[in-house]
Amino acid sequence: MEIKEDVKYLESHEWFKKEGNIGIIGISDYAQSEMGDVVFIELPEVGDEVTADKACATVESVKAVFEIISPMTGKVVEINEELLDAPEKINEDAFGSWFFKVELKGESSKLMDAGKYKGLCK
């Protein structure tokens, strides 16, 4: 299981990376391994507003449907359209398969660093 040091995490296993005023979101390697094979993903639309700690997307695997919680508040400026056609890429590379990018207005107060997240995943 890979846990990157340069991103922050929510307890619900989403990762968040900040690049200037843009936030990038995806799910952790731990999350994708627990989900099983991903078969469908529903993302917000460009222009949508997402709110920290609220559901903003869904991932369907062979096991169940999972709500994705936003680790930030802001306006969606880009989605990873490749995942809409090939959601299995999430299983192949959880950190390379970002879901969407947001122009940041705020971050969740529940974000944790890699060290704390490792403890959660044990």
Swiss-Prot record:
Protein encoded by which gene: gcvH
Function: The glycine cleavage system catalyzes the degradation of glycine. The H protein shuttles the methylamine group of glycine from the P protein to the T protein.
Ranges of residues in domain Lipoyl-binding: 22-103
Family matches, as Gene3D superfamilies: 2.40.50.100
List of residues that carry N6-lipoyllysine: K63
Keyword Magnesium assigned: no
Note on cofactor: Binds 1 lipoyl cofactor covalently.
Protein family: Belongs to the GcvH family.
Subunit structure: The glycine cleavage system is composed of four proteins: P, T, L and H.
UniProtKB keywords: Lipoyl
NCBIfam families the record matches: gcvH, PRK01202.1
This protein's name: Glycine cleavage system H protein
One Pfam entry name: GCV_H
InterPro entries hit by this protein: 2-oxoA_DH_lipoyl-BS, Biotin_lipoyl, GCV_H, GCV_H/Fam206, GCV_H_sub, Single_hybrid_motif
SUPFAM superfamilies: Single hybrid motif
Protein origin, superkingdom: Bacteria
Annotated GO biological process: glycine decarboxylation via glycine cleavage system
UniProt signal peptide: none
